[in-house]
């Protein structure tokens, strides 16, 4: 599974500005989804890869980004 890293309290994607390989996104994806996860910056949001099937990613149901 893959998807955008989401802030559970705001419903917003984690923003990033350095597209492609991005240490911030990689670190945040691993912190939220485990050390097997990967991450990079895609379309100014942190995109996480190698997630478990039940991983919660953006968009959150009934939670829009405020």
Swiss-Prot record:
InterPro entries: LCN-type_CS_alpha_beta_dom, Scorpion_toxin-like, Scorpion_toxin-like_sf, Scorpion_toxinL. Keywords: Amidation, Disulfide bond, Ion channel impairing toxin, Neurotoxin, Secreted, Toxin, Voltage-gated sodium channel impairing toxin. One of its GO terms (cellular component) is extracellular region. One of its GO terms (molecular function) is toxin activity. Its main location: secreted. Residues 1-66 form the LCN-type CS-alpha/beta domain. The keyword Cell inner membrane does not apply. Expressed by the venom gland. CDD domains: neurotoxins_LC_scorpion. It is found in: Secreted. It comes from the Eukaryota. The modification Asparagine amide is found at residue 66. GO terms for biological process: defense response. The keyword Oxidoreductase does not apply. Disulfide bonds join 12-65, 16-41, 25-46, 29-48. Beta toxins bind voltage-independently at site-4 of sodium channels and shift the voltage of activation toward more negative potentials thereby affecting sodium channel activation and promoting spontaneous and repetitive firing. Is active on the human voltage-gated sodium channel Nav1.6/SCN8A when tested at 200 nM. In vivo, is toxic to mice when intraperitoneally injected. Negative results: does not modify the currents of the human voltage-gated sodium channels Nav1.1/SCN1A, Nav1.2/SCN2A, Nav1.3/SCN3A, Nav1.4/SCN4A, Nav1.5/SCN5A and Nav1.7/SCN9A. Belongs to the long (4 C-C) scorpion toxin superfamily. Sodium channel inhibitor family. Beta subfamily. Has the structural arrangement of an alpha-helix connected to antiparallel beta-sheets by disulfide bonds (CS-alpha/beta). This is Beta-toxin Cbo1. The lineage of its organism: Eukaryota, Metazoa, Ecdysozoa, Arthropoda, Chelicerata.
């Amino acid at each position: 599974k893959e998807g955008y890293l989401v802030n559970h309290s705001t419903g917003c994607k984690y923003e990033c500005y350095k597209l492609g390989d991005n240490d911030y996104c990689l670190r945040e994806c691993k912190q939220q989804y485990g050390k097997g996860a990967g991450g990079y910056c895609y379309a100014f949001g942190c995109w996480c890869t190698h997630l478990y099937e039940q991983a919660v990613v953006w968009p959150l149901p009934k939670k829009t980004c405020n």
